[in-house]
C-alpha cells in the first residue's frame, strides 16, 4: 500500500519517493511486524487461555514434557496476522510473487488452524487425518506452483538451478516443475512441523532462513548483483525481501513469547504455514537446493522420523531413543535450552555455507 502511495504522492512532494525504496520498505515491514507481534502477543495469549486453546497433552515428546500441558497453543495466529498486515502495508501489491506467498500463507493457515482446532476440541492429538492433511497441502501447493508456471515470463522462472557451475541451469517441463515445486512446499511444511517440538526450536531457524532467502531475492532482483554471482536476474523477485522482512519481524516478535520457557506454542497453524512459506520462497527463487542446505536441521528432523519408523517396521528396533531427533538428545540427558541453541547454531552455519555456494560457480 505504501509503495502505491509513494507513486501517487511523489508528484506532490518528491520526498514521498522514499516509500518506493526497497530497503526502506523492507525495514518498515520488519519493524511493523515486530511491533505488531510484541503488542498483540499478550492480548492473543489471554484470548487463547480464555478460549481454552491449550496444549492438553504431549503429542510427541518425553515424559518431562507433561509439565508443558496447559500452555496456550495456536500462537502461530500471532505470527501470521502480523506477517499479513505488514506485507499488505509495505509490499508492492502489484507483484504476482507477493500474491503467491499470501495465497500459500492463507491456505496453510486454514489447514493448520483446522488441525489444531480438532485436536483441542476432541482432545485427540491426531487432528486432521494424515491423508486429508497431505491432500489439502498438495492442492494448495499445486495451485500456487501451477500459477507460477503459467504466468512465467522468462525461462529462468521455471528452471532448475544446480550448484557450483553457472551453466547448470535446466528448464523444467510443466509436470516436473509442478511436481517438484509442490514436493518442496509440502515437504518443507511438514519438516518445520516436526521440528517444532521444543521452545523456540523452529522459529529462529525460520527467521534465519527467511533472512537468507531474502538476501537471495534481493540479489536476483538486482541486475548487477545477479550478473556478478552468475545467477538468473528476475526483476520482480527483489520485492520478496519485503515479505521476508515481515516474516523476520513477526518471527522475532513471536520468539519474545516462545523462548524457553514458552508462554505460548505456535501450533500447527504456525509451523505448517511457516514451513510452506519458506518452501514457496525457495521455489519462486529457483534455489531449492540452496534452501535444502539452509534447512538441514529441518531435513535431519524429518529423516530421523522416517528412519525410526522404517527401522521399527522392518526390524522391530529403534535407531533413536525417540524421534524426531531433538527428543533423542533430550533422553540422552541434554538440557532443553542447550539442544535449542545448538540447533540454532547449526542452522546459522548451514545458511552461511548455502550462501557461499552462490559465489562458488
Residue ranges and their predicted role:
Residues 57-71, 125-136, 326, 331:
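Juxtamembrane helix-capping/reentrant segments at transmembrane boundaries
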Residues 75, 116, 268:
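Divalent metal-coordination and catalytic microenvironments
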Residues 119-129, 160-172:
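Membrane interface segments of multi-pass transport proteins and intramembrane proteases
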Residues 68-80, 132-140, 336-346:
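Select subsegments of transmembrane alpha-helices in polytopic membrane proteins
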Residues 42-60:
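Membrane-interface helix-loop junction between the first two transmembrane segments
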Residues 2-43, 83-96, 100-110, 148-150, ...:
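Alpha-helical transmembrane segments
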Residues 110-117:
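Alpha-helical transmembrane segments within multi-pass membrane transporters and channels
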Residues 141-145:
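Hydrophobic alpha-helical transmembrane segments of multi-pass inner membrane proteins, especially
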Amino acid at each position: 500500500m505504501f509503495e502505491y502511495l509513494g507513486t501517487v504522492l511523489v508528484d506532490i512532494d518528491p520526498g514521498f519517493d522514499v516509500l518506493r525504496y526497497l530497503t526502506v520498505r523492507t525495514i518498515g515491514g520488519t519493524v511493523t511486524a515486530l511491533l505488531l507481534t510484541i503488542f498483540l502477543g499478550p492480548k492473543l495469549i489471554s484470548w487463547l487461555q480464555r478460549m481454552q486453546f491449550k496444549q492438553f497433552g504431549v503429542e510427541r515428546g518425553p515424559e518431562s514434557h507433561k509439565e508443558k500441558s496447559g500452555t496456550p497453543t495456536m500462537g502461530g495466529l500471532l505470527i501470521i496476522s502480523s506477517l499479513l498486515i505488514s506485507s499488505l502495508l509495505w509490499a508492492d501489491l502489484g507483484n504476482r510473487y507477493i500474491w503467491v506467498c499470501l495465497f500459500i500463507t492463507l491456505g496453510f493457515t486454514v489447514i493448520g488452524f483446522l488441525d489444531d482446532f480438532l485436536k483441542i476440541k476432541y482432545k485427540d492429538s491426531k487432528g486432521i487425518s494424515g491423508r486429508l492433511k497431505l491432500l489439502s497441502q498438495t492442492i494448495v501447493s499445486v495451485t500456487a506452483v501451477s500459477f507460477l508456471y503459467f504466468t512465467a515470463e522468462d525461462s529462468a522462472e521455471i528452471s532448475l538451478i544446480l550448484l557450483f557451475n553457472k551453466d547448470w541451469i535446466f528448464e523444467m517441463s510443466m509436470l516436473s516443475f509442478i511436481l517438484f515445486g509442490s514436493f518442496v512446499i509440502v515437504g518443507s511444511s511438514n519438516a518445520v512441523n516436526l521440528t517444532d517440538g521444543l521452545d523456540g526450536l523452529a522459529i529462529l531457524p525460520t527467521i534465519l532462513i527467511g533472512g537468507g532467502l531474502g538476501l537471495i531475492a534481493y540479489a536476483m532482483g538486482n541486475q548487477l548483483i545477479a550478473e556478478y554471482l552468475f545467477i538468473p536476474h528476475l526483476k520482480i523477485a527483489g520485492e520478496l525481501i519485503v515479505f521476508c522482512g515481515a516474516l523476520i519481524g513477526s518471527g522475532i516478535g513471536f520468539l519474545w513469547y516462545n523462548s524457553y520457557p514458552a508462554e505460548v506454542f505456535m501450533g500447527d497453524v504456525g509451523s505448517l504455514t511457516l514451513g510452506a512459506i519458506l518452501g514457496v520462497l525457495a521455489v519462486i527463487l529457483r534455489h531449492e537446493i540452496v534452501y535444502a542446505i539452509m534447512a538441514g536441521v529441518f531435513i535431519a528432523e524429518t529423516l530421523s522420523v522416517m528412519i525410526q519408523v522404517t527401522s521399527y517396521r522392518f526390524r522391530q528396533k529403534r535407531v533413536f531413543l525417540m524421534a524426531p531427533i531433538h527428543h533423542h538428545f533430550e533422553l540422552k540427558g541434554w538440557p532443553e535450552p542447550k539442544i535449542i541453541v545448538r540447533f540454532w547454531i547449526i542452522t546459522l552455519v548451514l545458511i552461511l555455507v548455502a550462501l557461499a555456494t552462490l559465489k562458488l560457480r
